Amino acid sequence: MVSTKVKPTTTTTPTTTVNKTTQPTTTTTASKKVKQTKQSKAQAKEIQELASTPSVKQIQSQKVLVPKLEETKPITPPDQEEEDQEEEEQEQEEEENENNDNNTGNVSEKELGISKESIEFSNLPIEENTKKSIEEMGFKKMTPIQAKSILPLLEGKDLLGAARTGSGKTLAFLIPAIEVLVKSNFKPRNGTGVIIISPTRELALQIYGVARELMKYHTQTHGIVIGGASKKPEEERLEKGVNLLVATPGRLLDHLQNTKGFITKNLKCLIIDEADRILEVGFEEEMHQIIKKVPKTRQTMLFSATQTRKVDDIAKVSLNNSPVYVGVDDEREISTVEGLEQGYVVCPSERRFLLLYTFLKKNLSKKIIVFLSSCNAVKYTAELLNYIDIPVLELHGRQKQQKRTNTFYEFVNAEKGILICTDVAARGLDIPSVDWIIQYDPPDDPKEYIHRVGRTARGVGKKGRALLFLLPKELGFLKYLKLAKVPLNEYEFPKSKIANVQDQLEKVVSQNFYLYNSARDAYKAYICAYASHSLKDIFDVNALDLQCVAKAFGFLDPPKVNLNVNSSGKADFQKKSNNKSGFAQKQYGSKFPPKDGRQFDR
């Protein structure tokens, strides 16, 4: 195998100082508190050149469970300027080929066995006002899930749809749902005719935004009820009459049980989106109660990226005896979206943050999402990066709803930027033009990996890249990804090109009380999340070197924390941790934040 060498670049490494006049606008309130401390900021070295898009070596295509990892050195990255020029030329060519057709090529007539004309939205037997909205939104041709779902749904049939994230499910269920309301001449006094259930608040907001666009030429009312928002205004709107309602499960059940003016006796259609995700996050009991409380004489649409036992159970109690099944991905050889270049990098624990810092610093002109495993890890990483002049946004499950909503839309509307988040952003959200998905902490399983990378390369002809961080001992995870039909390449980031700012990082954390506590909580949350990993044969918490793990959080030695992990790892971890005398214990004594039992919240 031929290795391509990159010419070494000689760069100086001046110290970095923070100018108050250029402070990033995305700095969090917590970061501002950090900046108010009397301690001086770390003199972080400027990184050396690092190519943002490495060339790759393909995993060998062999009929074995574990992909063959060759001993030869992976191909080193090409020059960034050449790649950017190639990207620009490719984008220009794609724009010319599009010919003002946003969806050309979504689905072929041959694939569906129908005429060329019938795959266009304009030929659907729906209201002209809906067609007008669809045209203004820029859609012309249907995706496979839309072409196979909309007509049966317009006929009033129940449907179980299975399609990967980013396949166009939202329009597939909204168009028939709106048609039901219009044909029934629904008025506010009739109450709610359509209920759409979403697993997360952000996805609910996004679905509601699309519904609002589709309904702008119709007289029917629409609304949204989600956890975290004020309940009283929701009650008032429901009592006035909301014909199409988007909701999260917990808040919907609350209103069904307690809001007297919430009329659902005329319900025509119940839509459950991302059903597998709804059940994964613990809403199984709520879903069964909701289904019992809504009228049985209704149309039901259930969409799920994966078919699990729990999804089957919900399908049995919610769908009629002969639902239509639509699965557009059943024969696909690759589980992830097309146009997605995926890779992994093998990086030891102590160099993880250095590589992340270097990568982000080099790609400030890109739009990047970085996934971490816990709220505390997101909080600390965002605070630290903002503190050292890498502006980032943070999104996780412990933020107040208004903060989450504002952050989400700020990133959606940004042309470039970095979002540090938990898996709260990993399902269904449509964030345009994301260049990179970085999985800094490992996903729990291949299914979660697929949902994470589904945030990029969304839409026809779109491109995106994904990078998975793995420790050397975690390479066995590749066999699970291969079995899940996920093609991966190995990326190499030469050690000489990674910014060596470890000393400065440790100085920042040790000299700043607020950052130290945040880092300590993140360190603890990382280990506890690792201990709860489902693939314990690969992600063995007892095999972690705490000394190396601590370095990635800015510690010279592991801090003293009470690690509440499972019984098999508890004693071992307490022994390892207590053998290390963290420097902060000497500095701050017992001034540690109170225990937080929600460090796993996502």
UniProtKB/Swiss-Prot annotation:
Residue positions of motif DEAD box: 273-276
Major place of residence: nucleus
A Pfam family that the UniProt record links to this protein: DEAD
Domain Helicase C-terminal: start-end pairs: 339-509
GO cellular component, as recorded: chromosome; nucleolus
Gene Ontology terms: biological process: maturation of LSU-rRNA from tricistronic rRNA transcript (SSU-rRNA, 5.8S rRNA, LSU-rRNA)
Ranges spanned by the short sequence motif Q motif, renumbered to the chain: 119-147
Compositionally skewed regions (Basic and acidic residues) per UniProt: 593-602
Localisation per UniProt entry: Nucleus, Nucleolus; Chromosome
MF (Gene Ontology): ATP binding; ATP hydrolysis activity; RNA binding; RNA helicase activity
Keyword ATP-binding in record: yes
InterPro entries: DDX18/Has1_DEADc, DEAD/DEAH_box_helicase_dom, Helicase_ATP-bd, Helicase_C-like, P-loop_NTPase, RNA-helicase_DEAD-box_CS, RNA_helicase_DEAD_Q_motif, SPB4-like_CTE
Annotated TM spans: none
Entry keyword ATP-binding: yes
Disordered as annotated region, ranges: 1-108, 568-602
The organism's place on the tree of life at top rank: Eukaryota
Keywords: ATP-binding, Chromosome, Helicase, Hydrolase, Nucleotide-binding, Nucleus, Ribosome biogenesis, RNA-binding, rRNA processing
Enzyme class: hydrolase
Family per similarity comment: Belongs to the DEAD box helicase family. DDX18/HAS1 subfamily.
Purpose of the protein: ATP-binding RNA helicase which may be involved in the ribosome biogenesis.
Domain statement: The Q motif is unique to and characteristic of the DEAD box family of RNA helicases and controls ATP binding and hydrolysis.
UniProt-recorded name of the protein: Probable ATP-dependent RNA helicase ddx18
Gene of this entry: ddx18
